[in-house]
Amino acid sequence: WMKLQLRAGGVAYANNNVTRSSVGTISKGRGGWEDGALGYYNESQKASFPINYALLLLFNKELSDFSVDGLLGGSLYYTKTKNLEASTKNGLSVPGFYSIKASVESPIVDAETKTKKVNSLFGTLTLGYKDTYYLEATGRNDWSSTLPSNDKSYFYPFVGVSIIPSNIISLPDWIPFWKLRGSWTVSKTDLAIYDLDRAYTIKQNVWDGLNTASYPDYLRGDVKPITNRTWEIGTGIHFLQGHRLKLDVSYFNKLTYNNTISQRISSATGYKSRLMNIDEEYVRRGVEISIDATPVQVRDFSWDVSLNLSTSKRYYAKLDESFSPDNLWTYVGARTDSYSYKGYDKDPDGNYIINTNGLMSRSQYSSLIGYTDPDLEYGLANVFK
């Protein structure tokens, strides 16, 4: 009823690109339009090596009317990405000879290495009673290298309950299965690589062939991971003999907070911007519907159809007095996907106003035109076997 597993996996990804422009080509090279006319050559290489290790202790036990199922584990995720790019500058010294060595001036070279490491501990436990009532709890704690050294750790839980009424009440024969469920969870997203760690930027041929090293112009701050708190309720019903028609409906509510922005600050600090959390919060509400059917099922052939429908909208749950948009359509409860533009001025009779240049006068203020999120998303799949 208990077993130990060790899993290890990795992916090696490599991408090599070569760009050639012969002398006289009218195209924009890395150094400008003139590079194309004088000939141009570029080589770039990108390689990525993500690796993941996981140690899992799994257990499953039946105790009379009760069942216990779960796992405890830990994982190590490590990724390293290397980018190398080189290109000629101001043309090719020998037309038709495509090589970095053929650069008229010192070639432009760019190299970058990014690494990230995430250590995790996690566990999940599912308790069942009479194959009808279920309680599931999950906890996970991550330590990410992209977060501040004094606040690398973050925890996110999950709790779910479900009941199968078809096991305890009498239903028509054409409803063989019915399930109700609800869940609550918190998920967090760490930062991108080097969002906080500053490193010198090296530039070539800045002044008479001299190279320069400049410190980043953004200020490191204590930034918390972006957090989503979600609750969901749903039901699943199967119809007809053999469960040939299935309907699943769910409603979800997802609150997002600890959002981050890059905020401009006074250059007197020695920097131009600062990565920071803001107080603005959003809530996304939506409905998802899934319908699975088997219209045809004979001994040697079956046809399965799956239809998925979803609709959701995101609203402001809280505004930040300093950073939230200042307009008439931004308020708590308003949608966040507003689309606006500056239209044209009209007189009281509805006629367009013509300015002194003979053109329609552009309004100084933006107007709300509509919203960008789709009203409905859907997908249809057919499987023949």
Task: Give the location of each predicted region.
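Extracellular/periplasmic, surface-exposed regions of secreted and cell-surface proteins
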Residues: W1-S21, W33-R335, S340, L368, ...
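Short, Lys/Arg-rich amphipathic segments at extreme N-termini
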Residues: V23-T25
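Core alpha/beta catalytic barrel or barrel-like domain that forms the active/cofactor pocket
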Residues: S27-K28, E136
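Solvent-exposed beta-strand/coil patches in large extracellular/periplasmic or lumenal scaffold regions
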Residues: R220-D222, D349-G350, I354-L359, Y371
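Short Pro/Gly-enriched beta-strand edge/turn motifs at strand-loop
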Residues: S361-Y365
